[in-house]
Amino acid sequence: MKKVITYGTYDLLHQGHINLLRRAKELGDYLIVGVTSDSFDRERGKLNVRNNVLERIEAVRQTGYADEIVIEDYVGQKIDDIQRFGVDIFAIGSDWQGHFDYLKEFCQVVYLPRTEGISLSLIHI
């Protein structure tokens, strides 16, 4: 069984998020989605997150793409999760191109194309 993992805040879940989750799911047999905790978002300077972590988890669950959802709560958790779950592929949006290459030591890293015309800055009014 090929396991894929991806991470995100998934605030105000939109078509771009859904497309990314679908593409990540298509890479393997089992998709693990890491949703950032409220405190981890604040630590990283994401102060305008509208939905709390439970609302964001529920939105991801409702897409039907996630086989398992975990909460990302600390720096370094990606490596821990990859090893703990026996992940084969780490997938993330291409806007992070190169940023997660250090994970290639642990699994394959795939940068998925963004959905053109979708911007959270256009959604936050």
Descriptions of predicted regions:
Residues 1-122:
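Nucleotidyltransferase catalytic core that binds NTPs
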